[in-house]
Regions:
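Extracellular/periplasmic carbohydrate-active domains that bind, remodel
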Residues: 1-104
């Protein structure tokens, strides 16, 4: 059923090899193991109301998002949560490399 959580997936959402402008509205990604969202070779996208939540047990080392080789990405109203059971502090929310013109 769409919308039901699938625990222990390494990545919750992948967008790759897209140059055509696109939009995402009000997406919530929660409780994945490695990365909530992964963007690779993406350009000209706008993302509105993106929410991330990391669970204590499933994702103590999980990153909210990773972007590589992306350009012209705009993110508006991004929320990053960790549940109270996530006892480890988090230094990095988004890992970004080889990208241009990424705005939050």
């Amino acid at each position: 059923m769409f919308g039901q959580p699938v625990r222990m997936l390494p990545v919750g959402f992948i967008l790759a090899k897209r140059k055509t402008p696109g939009r995402i509205y009000a997406m919530s990604l929660e409780h994945h193991v490695r990365t909530e969202a992964r963007f690779h070779n993406v350009a000209n996208w706008k993302i509105y109301a993106f929410q991330f939540e990391e669970e204590g047990r499933e994702g103590p080392d999980c990153y909210m998002a990773e972007m590589s080789n992306c350009q012209n990405i705009e993110m508006v109203n991004v929320w990053m949560y960790r549940v109270i059971r996530a006892f480890m502090p988090k230094r990095i929310g988004f890992r970004i490399w080889d990208c241009k013109n990424i705005t939050f």
